Amino acid sequence: MEKMTIKDVDLKGKRVIMRVDFNVPVKDGVVQDDTRIRAALPTIKYALEQGAKVILLSHLGRPKGEPSPEFSLAPVAKRLSELLGKEVKFVPAVVGDEVKKAVEELKEGEVLLLENTRFHPGETKNDPELAKFWASLADIHVNDAFGTAHRAHASNVGIAQFIPSVAGFLMEKEIKFLSKVTYNPEKPYVVVLGGAKVSDKIGVITNLMEKADRILIGGAMMFTFLKALGKEVGSSRVEEDKIDLAKELLEKAKEKGVEIVLPVDTVIAQKIEPGVEKKVVRIDDGIPEGWMGLDIGPETVELFKQKLSDAKTVVWNGPMGVFEIDDFAEGTKQVALAIAALTEKGAITVVGGGDSAAAVNKFGLEDRFSHVSTGGGASLEFLEGKELPGIASIADKKK
């Protein structure tokens, strides 16, 4: 899938309206984690170096289509100014004369950030009037917000109906790596899935089963599969209404010759909190009532490492346990290290967004994978083989 990028257009003196993903945690008016802001810097800097006038659009949180002070982007403008080393002008409005005036006064090489796009009810409804207003401010639309690519909103899809839309560098990288692992992975291809819910991963399992050689399953979702196989899972989290589906997926994998690898042991405790009594049990011995599995055990870590050892392509989506608590983080950490080691051997390794990306950051391993996706829901939908509206709306490269 070849999309036009910011490098394919002349930006000198042009007004560029850029959809970025600045949906970052803010507390007491201070940005707590600026990973997403940093991720957008290469595209913003490139546009400025080319002599563009840059207008930035982003959402933050889930305001109900009206202004709400705790979701203001003002703290983001401040942090972006520090990271860019230059003033970022900020307009506390999304539409209207104040916005028009600020854009008219913008000079080449200057940046303007508008207020949270979701302060307007038309954003999430992809309202053509709102999109038309934003498009009227600029000559070119740059879409660098992969995190919202699975949503058809006014700021990413709507504007593209009125002015040409091209991909920013971050979007380009997401498309490149996710396309590779979804459509033409080098084999052996191993998929590692975790997280709480089987229901979130059904589409991914079904789609990647067509290409994968092995699928390793950890995280709380493993207990739904283990229960489907008749194992005793104690008080572990199980999606009772998905047990039959888990059986079907295991059958389907067998038919397709895909090896599904489930944990052989687990770290259990009676409560999900730090410092509680914990022990390791083998899955075949069963988990006692009142205890729940909160991480994969050491034998499973070794098994997973062995199943990963020859992989040329790895996709990892979802943690192996409750990694936020150190007592239950070891499984996730060891799997992350094993996948990182494969990157050094030349394998393509892609970490899906959301919790897996948070885990990788927690262990300081973010630079040791081919690609760590910035989009949770968007990366899942891409891996499911769906067409994402926020990518479809970007102009295709001319053949």
Swiss-Prot record:
It catalyses: (2R)-3-phosphoglycerate + ATP = (2R)-3-phospho-glyceroyl phosphate + ADP. One of its GO terms (molecular function) is ATP binding. Substrate binds at D21, F22, N23, R36, H59, L60, G61, R62, R118, R151. GO terms for biological process: gluconeogenesis; glycolytic process. Its EC number is 2.7.2.3. Pathway: Carbohydrate degradation; glycolysis; pyruvate from D-glyceraldehyde 3-phosphate: step 2/5. It comes from the Bacteria. Its main location: cytoplasm. GO terms for cellular component: cytosol. It is found in: Cytoplasm. Monomer. Belongs to the phosphoglycerate kinase family. This is Phosphoglycerate kinase. It comes from Thermotoga petrophila (strain ATCC BAA-488 / DSM 13995 / JCM 10881 / RKU-1). The gene is pgk.
